Amino acid sequence: MEVGQEYEIKNFTHRKFSMKHIAVMTSGGDAPGMNACLRAVVRAAHNNKLKIYGVLNGYEGLIDNQINKLTPREVGNIIQKGGSILKTSRSKRFLQEKFRALAIKNLTKKDINSLIVIGGEGSIKGAAMIAKESNLNVLGLPATIDRDLPLVGPTIGFDTAVNTALQAIDRIRDTASTSNTC
């Protein structure tokens, strides 16, 4: 990542927010905890009497207008599930300005003024682009097993991924030691 991009992301994370209608999306590779995060966002919005929309398939869904209302009932039983109920994608189209403009238009047509993006490095870069190119309030929630985001400590999913790998290694070692192969 170039220094200029870090600066843009730093500025983007310090914007003031005034949320009325919110869209939330997951993007890029999935990470453990995305559904739990999504559930928390939807419940918080509902408790504050805000309209909340879910974007299916990440940035591709923004471009294709796959934006639907979400209720607490729809996210009520997802906390223990892996992946993302909203699905994710990596979008090459979103890198083109005309498709970003279409994505922004799709949000504003539904009177959405705030976007929450749950994802890793590429997702957060995309969120920074939207923040820069629109009047939308944009919040990036880092969720990546790679822990490759600048200026960010632990991310949603990193600790779970590391501990899952460690448990698997411990089990393999235990199995190997019982057959005298170690």
Predicted feature locations:
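Glycine-rich oxoanion-binding loops at beta->alpha junctions
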Residues: L62-V117, S123, P154-D170
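Short, ordered loop/turn segments at secondary-structure junctions
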Residues: S27-D30, V55-G61, R90-S91, G120-S123, ...
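Short, Lys/Arg-enriched N-terminal segments with co-localized hydrophobic residues
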Residues: E6-S18
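Conserved anion/nucleotide-ligand pocket segment
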Residues: T178-C182
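Short Gly/Thr/Asp-enriched flexible loops that form oxyanion-binding sites at enzyme active sites
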Residues: A36-V41, E121-L136
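N-terminal phosphate-binding or glycine-rich loops at protein starts, especially the Walker A/P-loop
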Residues: F17-I63
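Short, acidic/small-residue loops that bind anionic groups at enzyme active sites
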Residues: Y53-V55, A131-T155, D159-T164
